[in-house]
Amino acid sequence: MSAGSRVDAPGLWIVLMRCHHALSKIAEGSIEDSGLGLTDFVALEALLHKGSQTITEIQSRVLLASGSMTAAVDRLEEKGLIRRTSAPGDRRVKVLKLTRAGRRVVETAYGRHAAELESAMSVLNPTEKQQLRAILKKLGLFAAGVGAKEAGDGHG
């Protein structure tokens, strides 16, 4: 494609979806290889990198439905990978914490996951990775704003 070629939005959407599909297969495969489901992994990863949190805090970070998150927390607690404790000052609020076993499992799984993604993205140099991140973030924020506006207008 020449520098002057026009790239239309539907064509770009197809490229984005194909890329997303290919990278998702790699990411999900690396997670499954660790014996975790995707929901369990993202909950453990959030606790690993952000520390103890409530279910609601994790949900908002990883964009999971309430039912999925509750089921994941129950599974992870049964496996001894996390524990629930009461929040200081409000015993009704439950805070999730990694156990030692949970930390070992998620550190190993995350290491494998990160290595697989690094390998998949090794075709990009550091500058291209920074540019891609900035462009995708810009597009995502704009699209989220457009979607919110359309939902408010009753047209979407």
Task: Please give the residue ranges for each predicted region.
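Short capping segments at the starts of secondary-structure elements
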Residues: 50-54
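C-terminal regulatory/oligomerization modules of transcriptional regulators
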Residues: 1-6, 126-156
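N-terminal leader segment of winged-helix/HTH proteins
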Residues: 1-34, 155-156
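The alpha-helix within a helix-turn-helix
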Residues: 59
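Charged, amphipathic alpha-helical coiled-coil/dimerization segments
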Residues: 24, 74-137, 141
